[in-house]
């Protein structure tokens, strides 16, 4: 990681630390510190650490130390204000590499020497320059591609819970995600505050499957200072912006786990003795999250795009918790994982009735996926919703008390979960396979129940008619 900006910045050195408070230093006697300015802290032993200015006021500055404040004394420690913001050197050479949360290589490879320097805070896209997301990204996951389609430039989070397989789903999507042939595609994967075994899983999976060739991994461990967790997603997005807007690539950014990011935000806010908001989180958490999520998108006149898939674990599976609640306001939908489906052995355990992709309609249809996609998705939602209701009713009155059509809905619900939702970890379904499978399952229902689908699509894609067409062409 480098800090550089502007011609010959003035370096100021102080030895006036008033207080060490958690990951923060309170430095007195400085009046010209700038917000986000980079700081170098030199201990009496000669050890050097990096930090940045979090708050500045008349006569003092609050400095966040990236490597932590353990061992820092208020006497004999030098604090240098470098007059620069935090930047990293970014290049397409970073694809295929593994870095720590600050952007330093940790895979044994050489440092990144070529490329351009970019401020990790990025530059927000002018709203007038934004292009509306409208192109399909195939993840190979039927529940996403078929019913909650992800579109280039979208922000589509995954809401999970402790113990659910969100990490497994994240790496499967990272391995399988594709755009139209002939277009350059890359994955930037940032693991935030993860345990050591999770970090090993991510690194080993990408390397063993070959997915590392088109990906860059940023891994921030749980035992590292909380301040680094606030840097990691911004470092990852800085690389993504270079790949997308400088090199014209389509980039999928996966951020896991944003709950760890928010916990770090709360920890540092508490150390600064700020007035807490909901459940102790800082009142500015919404705008802070927006500064990350809003770095996704497409721009007029630029070929590339950034699509974000942030993953967060909902404390106590509470979707009204401040973290998923605020995330939902900023992003364009959500994929919700179900503990009930997970306990029944269904992977991925996506609760489609609670999930939503607000931009789906823009990314599907003729020339993008298939003409029947929207109708099939609507019919799946309608039929599965009824099946879930009838399942609850059957538990009370018994299945034999239901009508023949209702029993077919129960059969549909079971087939939907066991064949459509459920798929293998290495099973990569094309959008055609997903839609054809949906038709097979919908064919369990009477044709009169498929009222969300146009007649022309029924006669073209329904297995009954496709079989007749096949027999007819075979007879000729």
UniProtKB/Swiss-Prot annotation:
Domain of life of the organism encoding this protein: Archaea
Principal localisation: membrane
A Pfam match: ATP-synt_ab
Gene Ontology biological-process entries: proton motive force-driven plasma membrane ATP synthesis
Gene3D superfamilies named in the record: 3.40.50.12240
GO cellular component, as recorded: plasma membrane
GO terms of molecular function: ATP binding; proton-transporting ATP synthase activity, rotational mechanism; proton-transporting ATPase activity, rotational mechanism
Location in or out of the cell: Cell membrane
Keyword Cell membrane among record annotations: yes
Coiled coil: none
UniProt keyword list: ATP synthesis, Cell membrane, Hydrogen ion transport, Ion transport, Membrane, Transport
Keyword Lyase belongs to the record: no
Subunit structure: Has multiple subunits with at least A(3), B(3), C, D, E, F, H, I and proteolipid K(x).
UniProt protein name: A-type ATP synthase subunit B
Organism: Hyperthermus butylicus (strain DSM 5456 / JCM 9403 / PLM1-5)
Name of the gene encoding the protein in the UniProt record: atpB
């Amino acid at each position: 990681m480098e800090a550089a900006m502007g011609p010959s910045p003035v370096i100021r050195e102080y030895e006036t630390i008033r207080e060490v408070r958690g990951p923060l230093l309170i430095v007195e006697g400085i009046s010209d510190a700038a917000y986000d300015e980079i700081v170098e802290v030199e201990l009496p032993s000669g050890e050097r650490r990096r930090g940045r200015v979090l708050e500045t006021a008349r006569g003092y500055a609050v400095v966040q130390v990236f490597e932590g404040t353990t061992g820092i004394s208020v006497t004999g420690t030098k604090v240098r204000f470098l007059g620069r913001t935090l930047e990293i050197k970014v290049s397409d050479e970073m694809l295929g590499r593994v870095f720590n949360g600050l952007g330093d290589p940790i895979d044994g490879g050489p440092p990144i020497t070529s490329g351009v320097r970019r401020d990790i805070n990025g530059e927000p896209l002018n709203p007038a320059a934004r292009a509306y997301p409208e192109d399909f990204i195939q993840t190979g996951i039927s529940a996403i591609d078929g019913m909650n389609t992800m579109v280039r430039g979208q922000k589509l989070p995954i809401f999970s819970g402790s113990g659910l397989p969100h990490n497994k789903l994240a790496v499967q999507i990272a391995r399988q995600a594709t755009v139209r042939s002939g277009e350059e595609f890359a994955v930037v994967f940032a693991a935030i505050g993860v345990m050591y075994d999770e970090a090993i899983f991510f690194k080993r999976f990408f390397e063993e499957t070959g997915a590392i060739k088109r990906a860059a991994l940023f891994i921030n461990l749980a035992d590292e200072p909380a301040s680094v967790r606030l840097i990691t997603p911004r470092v990852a997005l800085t690389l993504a912006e270079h790949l997308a807007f400088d090199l014209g690539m389509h980039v999928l950014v996966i951020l896991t786990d944003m709950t760890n990011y928010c916990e770090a935000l709360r920890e540092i806010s508490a150390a600064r003795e700020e007035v807490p908001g909901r459940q102790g989180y800082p009142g500015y958490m919404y705008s802070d999250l927006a500064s990350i999520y809003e770095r996704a998108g497409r721009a007029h006149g630029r070929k590339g795009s950034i699509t974000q898939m942030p993953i967060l674990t909902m404390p106590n599976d509470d979707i009204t918790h401040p973290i998923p609640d605020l995330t939902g306001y900023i992003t364009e939908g959500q994929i919700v994982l179900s503990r009930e489906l997970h306990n029944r052995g269904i992977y991925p355990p996506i609760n489609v009735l609670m999930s939503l992709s607000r931009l789906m309609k823009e990314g599907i249809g003729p020339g993008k996926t298939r003409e029947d996609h929207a109708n099939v998705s609507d019919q799946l939602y309608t039929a599965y919703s009824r099946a879930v209701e009838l399942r609850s009713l059957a538990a009370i009155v018994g299945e034999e008390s239901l009508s023949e059509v209702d029993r077919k809905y129960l059969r549909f619900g079971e087939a939907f979960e066991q064949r459509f939702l459920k798929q293998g970890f290495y099973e990569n379904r094309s959008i055609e396979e997903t839609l054809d499978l949906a038709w097979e399952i919908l064919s369990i229902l009477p044709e009169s129940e498929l009222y969300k689908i146009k007649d022309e699509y029924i006669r073209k894609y329904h297995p009954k008619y496709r079989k007749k067409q096949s027999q007819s062409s075979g007879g000729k």
